[in-house]
Amino acid sequence: MMLRMRRLVIATTNPGKVIEIRSALGEMAGWSLEALPPDTRSIEETGSTFLENAMLKAEHYSQLAGSLTLADDSGLWVRALGGRPGVHSSRYAENPGARIQRVLGEMKSVPDGRRDAVFYCALAVAKRGKIIWTVQRDVVGVIAHAPSGSEGFGYDPVFLLPDLNRTMADLNTDDKNRLSARGKALAELRKFLLSD
């Protein structure tokens, strides 16, 4: 008997995010994971929370793809910056390097003990424009004084896990999938998809 593959579209054109999602979900019998075409136009993220933005994207792209669609919205919340960059994390500067430099510049005079930060991840799954599942996870850390590590993407090089004294970008893929907000959220998604 031939197993019918179910399709899950990953609603992003960010190659780093696609790699991370595929890695965290691993092989799932009966599922085919597909990314959006690179020329897909992004929609305006008008939500005031990560979950609202994930839901907006999941609803929109599930209608375009005609398939079950996963959307993610995630970002960095820094107490000393009044919660910035927050839902504007991916738009805080023109490119990932500039975003990191902006955060480090704004944190330059902030002493240890006041550099706490939270990385949030919200996932939403939609089918034919309707949300059918959501999850939110976070991880607590601090902003490092300088970038470290070459793994990951985004703010990973400056998001330090104090218990390990390593940034997210210092971690190997397995550790990052286990400890990161996105990794924790994707573990929940995997359970959801395989239980259906």
PLM regions with names:
Residues 3-9, 15-196:
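Anionic-ligand binding patches
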